[in-house]
From Swiss-Prot:
UniProt KW keywords: Aminoacyl-tRNA synthetase, ATP-binding, Cytoplasm, Ligase, Nucleotide-binding, Protein biosynthesis
Source species of the chain: Streptococcus mutans serotype c (strain ATCC 700610 / UA159)
Lineage: Bacteria, Bacillati, Bacillota, Bacilli, Lactobacillales
Molecular functions per Gene Ontology: aminoacyl-tRNA deacylase activity; ATP binding; leucine-tRNA ligase activity
Gene: leuS
Catalytic activity: tRNA(Leu) + L-leucine + ATP = L-leucyl-tRNA(Leu) + AMP + diphosphate
Record-given protein name: Leucine--tRNA ligase
Annotated EC: 6.1.1.4
Motif 'KMSKS' region, residue range(s) on this chain: 610-614
Length: 833
């Protein structure tokens, strides 16, 4: 049996591609363009696992396919290399995070190159390179100039163990940090914010024009959270104070029986009575220990404290008590709500807990038993009585505006983006704070502001970053003698990844972010492949920065990514005991087809689970490439199932993919290759070309591979293989298994040239038409035989063929034939006595 030597072939062709710059991006503007982008990786110490190449293989297949179709293809790779893990490692070990990051990048790059991806490495970028982050800082200075980057004293999600504040999006539902799983507490701090809220409406509207999964668009819509309603102003009894609430249901104002302020609301300390001061102070402290997510969890027990103060309901003059409760957030809306417990579940539970009034203002339901949250005609509502929801809202908004106690309002759930981190390993923020109280951004000719090299990267202990320890770097003096201090916060990891797709277009430009003509040529990204976990972080931030750059006239498109595709997750094999607890794979042995815990001898259930180091079920692509070859890994990951499905890794599936490639190798190298076409494979070959082409366009890679298998099966049944069909088949294979395809292309052509830019095969529509067709022969409606006949045979010919058939003759012998019914291209039915 002949097998191909994957190590020799893959090493040979990877060297050829590198030596010949095979995948250098074409610049001829006469050709159509195709920009295929991967979400660039964070280069962790663990290196690649087999989940990474799934998305990378998909974009590589599309890139190779499009090159063969005559497109200029931009297919780059780089490194999202700032971030907490490298800094944490450096603090734990005393190593420089830059050195650690460089080692990790070298490992990732070696692994990625071993998989044969057709990246243009001349365009490689690294977010920690000062030549790159010069432009990250430049974008920040432009945001600052336009008032979209500002400082504010805000309650932040502080993580003591990380020594930094993190964004709302980085807090898990259990109130711990996404990175590290550490406790998160609320703490007021001076922070840099980016005014993403200024773009809320455009971020929402422009989703309609994108070819993205609807689930991702919905997640962004929900995160932006547009609400239409009204602001209502409540006066505080016996004071000059007032507060504003936003409500989507101003029509229920007659049912507002109490108000709730966030514990952090500015009014709380002003209006709290002496008798309630201690209870309020204690409650505020407890609230500060909880994350926003923990505070707003619908399932948690309702807590709160009365301030001792009352507000006046503007629509009926009634006094209503003012409470504080942690489920109201200072950062959301106005930090105050009017509570209508008859028609809101959370308000109803709170009112029941603290024995507050519940007044129904909509017909229907029994508010003594539960809140009524459906619609109904208005009751107990003065001038709104008898009106439906829409009419009542309109009438109430008109009344509020006429009386000067409210107005129509659109709000968004989206908060401004907390942009500063109290860490060392990030882009320095290019701002100087002067002793006269002013602040200035560095001019472009002073960028990049380079991150100083230091071993002293432990948190400062003051809430500032370790940069506060570096006096020589920190302190500056202006020409007029005024002293200043550099900003010590650094940018979050999201900064460099919010625009990296633009730098790939012109990565070596030291005069501007990228050349305008090149940006016009390549934008938008045609297909962006990556994980769905980035729906409301990276993807929203990148869209915001892109729209800002569009407003500046830097980029020519409103949106960065035209098509988004989320690949599924490759799951590892895991084992569970009778309690459902996961058991690490090194504690499992297989006996007689079953799996047992080595330590307890308990039989275990096998189940797929996310690959993790703790379960020891992470598959390293290096091992797969060594044993099976890169082409096998590529074909297997694409053949596992639909690209967007999450599927368990299978060694048997890997072996099956390798066997298929060995069959391809044997077919081409051992079958007689004929210069003349005998026509036997016309139909199957043309069908395969047509179908594979369609499935590649639709990113249905698993079914495209199935078609390749169909051709191999059909070709193996023939004595010889027509040369043009052999070559065409290898071209179809090339995007999936490029090393083997290059080797077999040379075997067939002896050209000495790569297959990369050979024109994609076409198919002959006329060859897809069936010349012959199978019909059934029946006696009294029951099938007795099947025969292949010429397509569109006449009734007379079909009758003759049926009566000449051996099986039919045996059945009708000695019997009278009453009639013969022939239906062209379908059947012949013989009726006998």
């Amino acid at each position: 049996m002949v097998y191909y030597n994957h190590k020799a072939i893959e090493n040979k062709w990877q060297k050829f591609w590198e030596d010949n710059h095979t995948f250098k991006t074409g610049t001829a503007s006469s050709k159509p363009k195709f920009y295929a982008l991967d979400m660039f990786p964070y280069p962790s110490g663990a290196g690649l696992h087999v989940g990474h190449p799934e998305g990378y293989t998909a974009t590589d297949i599309l890139s190779r396919f499009k090159r063969a179709q005559g497109y200029n293809v931009l297919h780059p790779m780089g490194w999202d290399a700032f971030g907490l893990p490298a800094e944490q490692y450096a603090m734990d070990t005393g190593h420089d995070p830059a050195d650690f990051t460089a080692q990790n990048i070298a490992t990732f790059k070696r692994q990625i190159k071993s998989l044969g991806f057709s990246y243009d490495w001349d365009r490689e970028i690294n977010t920690t390179d000062p030549n790159y982050y010069k432009w990250t800082q430049w974008i920040f200075t432009k945001l600052y100039e336009k008032g979209l980057a500002y400082e504010a004293e805000v309650p932040v999600n502080w993580v003591e163990e990380l020594g930094t504040a993190i964004a709302n999006e980085e807090v898990l539902p259990d109130g711990t940090s996404e990175r590290g799983g550490y406790p998160v507490v609320r703490k007021p701090m001076r922070q840099w914010m980016l005014k993403i809220t200024a773009y809320a409406e455009r971020l929402l509207e422009d989703l309609e024009d994108l070819d993205w999964p609807e689930s991702i668009k919905d997640m962004q819509r929900n995160w932006i959270g547009k609400s239409t309603g009204a602001n209502v102003t409540f006066k505080v009894k016996d004071t000059d104070e007032e507060f504003t609430v936003f409500t989507t249901r101003p029509d229920t104002l007659f049912g507002a029986t109490y108000a709730v302020l966030a514990p952090e609301h500015d009014l709380v300390d002003i209006i709290t009575t002496a008798g309630q001061a201690q209870a309020v102070a204690d409650y505020k402290h407890q609230a500060s220990l909880k994350s926003d997510l923990a505070r707003t969890d619908l399932a948690k027990e309702k807590t709160g404290v009365w301030t001792g103060a009352y507000a006046i309901n503007p629509v009926n003059g009634k006094e209503i008590p003012i409470w504080i409760a942690d489920y109201v957030l200072a950062s959301y809306g106005t930090g105050a709500i009017m509570a209508v417990p008859a028609h809101d579940e959370r308000d109803w539970e709170f009112a029941k807990q603290f024995n507050l009034d519940i007044i129904p203002v909509l017909e229907g339901g029994n508010v003594a038993e539960a809140a009524y949250t459906d619609d109904g005609l208005h009751i107990n509502s003065g001038f709104l009585n008898g009106l439906d929801k829409a009419a009542a809202i309109d009438k109430m908004v008109t009344w509020l505006e006429t009386e000067g106690v409210g107005n129509k309002k659109v709000t968004y759930r989206l908060r401004d983006w907390l942009f500063s981190r109290q860490r060392y390993w990030g882009e320095p923020i290019p701002i100087i704070h002067w002793e006269d109280g002013t602040s200035t951004a560095l001019p472009e000719n002073e960028l990049p502001l380079v991150l100083p090299v230091t071993k002293d990267i432990k948190p400062s202990g003051t809430g500032e970053s370790p940069l506060a320890n570096l006096t020589d770097w920190l302190e500056v003096t202006r020409e007029d003698g005024v002293k200043g201090r550099r900003e010590t916060n650094t940018m979050p990891q999201w900064a460099g990844s919010s625009w990296y797709f633009l730098r790939y277009i012109d990565p070596h430009n030291d005069q501007k972010l990228a050349d305008e003509d090149l940006l016009k040529q390549w934008l938008p990204v045609d297909v962006y492949v990556g994980g769905a976990e980035h729906a409301v972080l990276h993807l929203l931030y990148a869209r915001f920065w892109h729209k800002f750059l569009y407003d500046l006239g830097v980029v020519p498109t409103k949106e960065p990514f035209q098509k988004l595709f989320n690949q599924g997750m490759i799951l590892g094999t895991s084992y569970r005991d009778h309690r459902g607890a996961l058991v690490a794979t090194d504690k499992v042995e297989k006996r007689d087809g079953s799996f047992f815990n080595i330590e307890t001898d308990e039989e275990l259930e096998q189940a797929p689970a996310k690959m993790s180091k703790s379960l020891k079920n992470v598959v390293n692509p290096d091992d797969v490439v060594e044993q099976y070859g890169a082409d096998t890994l590529r074909v297997y990951e694409m053949f596992m199932g639909p690209l967007d499905a999450s599927i368990a890794w299978s060694e048997e599936g890997l072996e099956g993919s390798r066997k298929f490639l060995d069959r391809v190798y044997r077919l081409i190298t051992t079958k007689e290759i004929a210069a003349k076409n005998n026509g036997h494979l016309d139909k199957v070959y043309n069908e395969v070309v047509k179908t594979v082409t369609e499935h590649l366009e639709a990113m249905r890679f698993n079914t495209a591979i199935s078609q390749l298998m169909i051709f191999v099966n059909a070709a193996n049944k023939e004595e010889q293989l027509f040369l043009d069909y052999a070559k065409g088949f290898i071209q179809l294979l090339a995007p999936f298994a490029p090393h083997l395809a290059e080797e077999l292309w040379q075997f067939l052509t002896q050209s000495g040239q790569s297959i990369t830019y050979v024109a994609w095969p076409s198919y002959d529509e006329s060859k897809l038409v069936e010349d012959e067709i199978e019909i059934v022969l029946q006696i009294k409606g029951k099938v007795r035989a099947k025969v292949v006949v010429s397509k569109d045979s006449s009734r007379e010919d079909l009758e003759k063929i049926a009566l000449a058939n051996d099986k039919i003759q045996a059945e009708v012998a000695g019997k009278d034939i009453v009639k013969v019914i022939a239906v062209p291209n379908k059947l012949v039915n013989i009726v006998i006595k």
